[in-house]
């Protein structure tokens, strides 16, 4: 079994901390069933991942991209803004392109309270027999 050290891999990945992150991510991928790019030689997954990086059978940039993708919880999707949004500086100016009006219904405080009471479940009072 050949000993793989950080010095063997540091010329492939500049930062040793990034190297550890990439090797750990690759070791987890191997544990979850990813194909090996080199012979295992009875080595454990972290050693195999370091050997893959040292022998350049995997691309560190691809590994970095996969690592970032695996850590993302939410993917941002750029949605187009509607064309009718007025600019901040032109608050007093009118938009002539589209004359859509939004009707806003005003509610009194009493109507709002009645509506909220209808949404809340009633608490039942336990009946006590004496």
Swiss-Prot record:
Reactions listed under catalytic activity: RNA(n) + a ribonucleoside 5'-triphosphate = RNA(n+1) + diphosphate
GO molecular-function terms, A-Z: DNA binding; DNA-directed RNA polymerase activity
Record carries keyword Kinase: no
EC number: 2.7.7.6
Cellular component GO terms held in the UniProt record: DNA-directed RNA polymerase complex
UniProt key word Nucleotidyltransferase: yes
Region (Disordered): 80-99, 110-130
Record SMART domains: RNA_pol_Rpb6 (SM01409)
Any one Gene Ontology BP term: DNA-templated transcription
Keywords: DNA-directed RNA polymerase, Nucleotidyltransferase, Transcription, Transferase
Compositionally biased tracts (Basic and acidic residues): 110-124
Membership in a protein family: Belongs to the RNA polymerase subunit omega family.
Main function: Promotes RNA polymerase assembly. Latches the N- and C-terminal regions of the beta' subunit thereby facilitating its interaction with the beta and alpha subunits.
Assembly notes: The RNAP catalytic core consists of 2 alpha, 1 beta, 1 beta' and 1 omega subunit. When a sigma factor is associated with the core the holoenzyme is formed, which can initiate transcription.
Protein's name in the database: DNA-directed RNA polymerase subunit omega
Gene responsible for this protein: rpoZ
